[in-house]
A protein has these predicted regions:
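Bacterial Sec-dependent N-terminal signal peptides
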Residues: 1-20, 998, 1002-1016
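N-terminal hydrophobic targeting/anchoring segments and the immediately downstream early-domain regions
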Residues: 18-109, 450
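Preference for extracellular/luminal or secreted protein segments
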Residues: 18-57, 269, 291-564, 568
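Second-shell residues forming the walls of enzyme active-site clefts
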Residues: 30, 66, 74-91, 101-103, ...
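A short, well-structured edge-of-sheet supersecondary motif
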Residues: 64, 237, 342, 583-617, ...
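Catalytic loop of the DD-peptidase/beta-lactamase superfamily, centered on the K-T-G motif
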Residues: 559-597, 601-603, 769, 786-791, ...
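Short active-site loop at a secondary-structure junction
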Residues: 574, 581-592, 614-677, 764-777, ...
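Short, surface-exposed loop or secondary-structure junction motifs
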Residues: 666-927
């Protein structure tokens, strides 16, 4: 009677609340059924042989719940529905999903280890992780997640906690654990803090033996218990008690999970925890060793636990409990009290979600784009910089660097290497951790030509048992690289870095993981694609304490999921359909689309093939003839840079820079007029037609209808006379003296080539200064640039712009400097040149001027073009270097005249703002936007209002330029409109760092899960 009175005093108030379902259900259960409710059995969705036996066990022993382990989401959902049908009282379904359901189930999102979350300064992101995991649990009918891990990782040799902990700082661990738990709670999922009273400072694995925490109670109270006390203060609904020997609390060597002093006295009475108390898995050797089957489960119940998790033998456990009841060692009142506590939890966490799991598109719903983006964000924000001598990172002045990477270890780092190549040319080497001294010396010799070495330590491991992957070959290598700039990238736990921390390294970055996403962000961090702001979750010796982390600025383009830049990736997928339809309709053999927003590339895909013969698929790294994009990618930046240097003035005349024009009608034309296409110059000179021998023709060269002479159809409404021949001393189809190569099998006589500048100089003017697009004007601008700089245009922009930017796949004359395999053929000109134009410029003027011209001739990739367009969006800076003054960018990119006169900026095209008039951009492009198109089917456009860059590349001129389906069907504008339709609503709240465990609720990423329509 005294025992029962004490028991009633200890029962939390929640057990006496009026809960009709709990009371009626409890009254309807027999004692045996109440005992069954105390057990959560192990379940697997990858073991068909166990399914029937488990269902029979549920029926026979009236199990209260299941904890699922490995398998697939679809099978687990089906099994959950099946097992729930077999249960009289709804089962409480649990999972050990610290990193999400993907921790256990294939094909689902697995979030990074808690150590990465501990490296993040923004607690709000941890809340969102918990919320996302909670959503996944709900989709799978999971009611309980055995997380967060509240252990403080103060022992580097801990074999079981390690990176599962948020770190070694008690405040950081507490805040992160509370944020994670509240995220779960926001989705109605029970969080269970573990491993009480703290598993962080152990050197043994409780799966195998009983670890000891050999500290005084005062130390445990101030370190190990600190996060748990914070969690309990927030109303933590569940706790998991570990199998630990803690002499300070119970000198009898009884595991904490079996100790009344720890479970009842410490947890319930001292810390006032009134939630559900779970044991750690009861099949672990740390608790079962030396005890007969079922004995430990009985002791756990007597200690004060509510739920026996993963019993070794449920039949033996039930038998032990019944025998204890018969002997009076345990009372029916205790069983009823524990059962009632479980039913109270079920009423809150199970009953509201008791409908069968919907398996429709389950895997798709478990992988929402917003959550894939959140996973990326975690890896990005965790990147930690602990050393940065002379502010080496982010790397600047790429034109001064010769970069090489070396993968130390035997795990491939392909993603890391490819990500480096987005920013600069990079040679790649590797060295095994088992390398000999001779191997090290050989690699050092191979690295001699390079002055910047990026080491990626793929040998690093998270386990103390493997000595964290240490090898003395890495220090030996670093010592031999003295005199070079050496950056170490560490993809593992901080503890693994300690032996290398004091080496002569210029910079040290931690990515904490070898995951491809982490590899990508490490590379981005090196070059300034992301801002680095992570903190150490655990110390690396005294030099680098927990919480330490340097910061860097974002200086270059980064790469991430569209949702992180406020774009809907599902909506952007419509671009794929438009491109495939365009290719199917033969608007072009292939194409590429790139979209960047807020300084991040969010979409970059290639479609189709280089040619209709389909021999080489298009790739995102392909190089295109960008035609008139040359104007804004080479000529225009040169003009702006010279304008900033006061070497060219907009209202100065051509004659100021080109004395040969002083006696011509071109002398008074100003630079401004050329940039506005208001100089009176003709659009172009038809040099091929100009060279046709009239004597070779019967009738006209071209006709709008078929005639006896004009028999070859070029396109609808255009026919050519195929019998034409070129005049002597103009062009030849065979190599001979005094002829220069134009394209394969096509040559120009040197006299005719020399006459082209003269023809341009004396070309006819229109007599008015109205807008009329002219290529000739940009040829004159090229000549002015070359006169001022005393260098060819291609050499000057390469040295002043492309190479410093890291745009090393951009150049004129690609056969001399670029990889021909990646160059997309522009045309198979069988009309005038009878040549395949593969690495030879398509534009006739540029071709006849030797391949370098101010109007065309440039070859480039989407990524390189994006770098230049981003320079414009950044008001003239890129990579931490200023190229053009911000005022100059503002001047050149704004409309110069009223819309009725000229919509253009200086060199840039602008949207047409007059209703009903054709526009180069889609109707959603704002007036502030600008860009340019190109004849080969290319387009580049910036929208500063929305911080958008859109690039479209194609070779629509293959096999010939007379295919205008791309323009007629408005393919480029269609895609641009899709981009605008994908813009997500602007949010007032932004992700911010937090110092209070309550502040994280204000934290948000660009696309909150609550706004997802397709995946709720």
């Amino acid at each position: 009677m005294i025992y029962k009175s004490l028991l009633l005093l200890l029962l939390p108030r929640v057990l006496f609340a009026q809960t009709p379902w709990v009371d009626s259900t409890l009254d309807a259960l027999s004692l045996e059924q109440q005992i069954g409710q105390l057990f959560m059995l192990a379940a697997y969705s990858n073991d068909d042989a166990r399914e029937d036996a488990l269902e029979e066990t549920i029926r026979k022993y009236h199990a209260g719940g299941l904890i699922f382990f490995q398998g697939t989401p679809e099978k687990q959902a089906l099994l959950t529905n099946r097992y729930q049908r077999a249960a009289r009282v709804p089962l409480m379904i649990g999972m050990d999903a610290e990193g999400g359901v993907g921790w256990r189930l294939s094909g689902c999102i697995e979030y990074p280890a808690n150590a990465l979350l501990g490296a993040i300064r923004e607690d709000g992101l941890v809340y969102r992780v918990g919320k996302s995991i909670g959503r996944h649990c709900r989709l799978l009918g999971i009611h309980v997640n055995f997380a967060p891990v509240a252990d403080v990782n103060v022992n580097p040799l801990n074999p079981v906690i390690g990176i599962r902990s948020f770190g070694e700082e008690i405040d950081n661990v507490s805040r992160k654990a509370v944020a994670y738990a509240d995220g779960l709670a926001s989705r109605g999922v029970m969080a269970v803090a573990k491993h009480f009273p703290g598993h962080g400072d152990t050197d043994a694995d409780s799966h195998l033996v009983l670890p000891r925490v050999n500290h005084p109670a005062s130390r445990i109270d101030s370190i190990e218990l600190y996060p748990f006390k914070h969690l309990f203060a927030t109303g933590m609904p569940g706790v998991l008690v570990a199998h630990l020997d803690i002499p300070a609390y119970d000198p009898s060597r009884v595991p904490a999970s079996l100790s009344p002093r720890i479970v009842t006295r410490l947890l319930r009475e001292t810390l006032h925890f009134d939630g559900l108390c779970f044991t750690d898995a009861m099949n672990m050797k740390g608790v079962t060793r030396g005890r007969k089957k079922g004995e430990a489960d009985l002791l756990a119940l007597l200690a004060g636990n509510d739920v026996i998790l993963f019993p070794e033998d449920v039949a033996a456990s039930v038998r032990e409990i019944k025998e204890a009841l018969a002997k009076g060692l345990i009372s029916e009142a205790l069983i009823r009290e524990r059962c009632r506590r479980i039913l109270v939890a079920k009423e809150k966490y199970v009953l509201p979600y008791s409908t069968p799991i919907d398996t429709t598109r389950l895997r798709q719903r478990l992988n929402a784009p917003e959550e894939i983006a959140l996973k990326q964000k975690i890896y990005e924000k965790a990147i930690t910089l602990v050393k940065n001598d002379r502010f080496l990172l982010p790397l600047a002045r790429l034109d001064t660097l010769r970069v090489a990477s070396l993968n130390f270890g035997d795990r491939p780092a392909k993603t890391f290497e490819q990500a480096l190549e987005r920013y600069a040319p990079c040679a790649h080497f590797s060295l095994s951790r088992e390398a000999t001294a001779a191997d090290v010396n050989r690699r050092v010799e191979q690295l001699a030509p390079y002055n910047c070495i990026i080491l990626y330590n793929s040998a690093a491991r998270n386990s103390a048992a493997s000595q964290f992957g240490y090898s003395d070959r890495l220090p030996a290598l670093v010592q031999k690289l003295r005199g070079k700039r050496v950056i170490l990238c560490h993809p593992a736990a901080p503890h693994a870095l300690q032996p290398y921390a004091l080496l002569p390294l210029d910079a040290i970055l931690l990515g904490y993981s070898h995951d491809p996403i982490a590899q990508d962000y490490l590379a981005q961090a090196i070059f300034g694609g992301i801002r680095v702001e992570g903190q150490l979750p655990a110390s690396i010796g005294p030099a680098f304490p927990a919480g330490f982390g340097l910061t860097t600025s974002k200086t270059r383009l980064g790469y991430h999921q569209p949702e992180l830049s406020g774009l809907n990736s599902v909506a952007l997928q419509r671009i794929d359909s438009v491109c495939r339809v365009a290719i199917r309709r033969k608007a072009a053999p292939g194409c590429q689309v790139m979209v960047a927003r807020n300084g991040f590339v969010v979409y970059n895909k290639a479609f189709g093939f280089h040619t209709y013969e389909k021999k080489r698929p298009n790739a995102p790294t392909d190089i295109y003839d960008v035609a008139s994009l040359t104007k804004i990618m080479a000529t225009l930046p040169a003009i702006m840079m010279l304008h900033d240097r006061r070497q060219i003035a907009l209202d100065s005349t051509l004659a100021c820079y080109l004395p040969d024009l002083r006696t011509t009608d071109k002398a008074p034309i100003t630079i401004r007029e050329l940039l506005l296409h208001m100089s009176g110059l003709k659009p172009a000179i038809a040099f091929f037609q100009h060279a046709v021998d009239p004597a070779s023709l019967i009738g006209r060269l071209l006709s709008t209808r078929r005639t006896p002479a004009n028999t070859r159809e070029l396109r609808a409404g255009l026919y050519i006379n195929p019998s034409f021949r070129y005049r002597d001393s103009t062009f030849s189809f065979k190599e001979q003296e005094h002829y220069r190569l134009v394209s394969p099998g096509f040559y120009i006589h040197e006299r005719y080539a020399d006459s082209i500048p003269i023809l341009l100089r004396h070309s006819e003017l229109s007599g008015h200064k109205r807008y009329a697009y002219s290529d000739i004007g940009f040829v004159f601008l090229q000549q002015a640039i070359e006169a001022i700089t005393a260098q060819p245009l291609n050499a000057w922009v390469q040295r002043q712009l492309f190479h410093p930017l890291g745009a090393d796949d951009t150049d004129f004359l690609p056969l001399q400097t670029l990889d021909l395999q990646r160059v997309v053929p522009a045309s198979d000109d069988q009309v005038f040149r009878e040549s395949l134009l593969h690495g030879h410029v398509h534009d006739p003027t540029a071709a006849l001027l030797g391949g370098v011209s101010g109007n065309a001739g440039l070859f480039s990739t989407a990524e390189d073009l994006a770098k230049i367009m981003t320079l414009y969006l950044n008001h003239g800076t890129y990579g931490g270097q200023r190229y053009i003054d911000s005022a100059t960018i503002a001047l050149f990119t704004r409309a110069q005249l009223p819309p009725g006169q000229n919509r253009r900026g200086l060199g840039f095209d602008k949207p047409e703002t007059r209703p009903g008039k054709p526009s180069p951009a889609g109707p959603s492009a704002p007036a502030a936007s600008y860009g340019h198109g190109g004849f080969t089917g290319v387009f580049a456009w910036n929208d500063p209002d929305n911080q958008l860059t859109y690039i479209f590349l194609s070779n629509r001129t293959y096999p010939d330029e007379f295919n205008d389906k791309l323009n007629k069907e408005n393919i480029r504008s269609q895609i641009q409109e899709i981009i605008y339709s994908a813009l997500l609503p602007r949010l007032d709240e932004k992700t911010t760092s937090t110092t209070s465990p309550d502040d994280y609720r204000l934290s948000i990423i660009h696309c909150p899960l609550s706004q997802s329509l397709a995946y709720q």
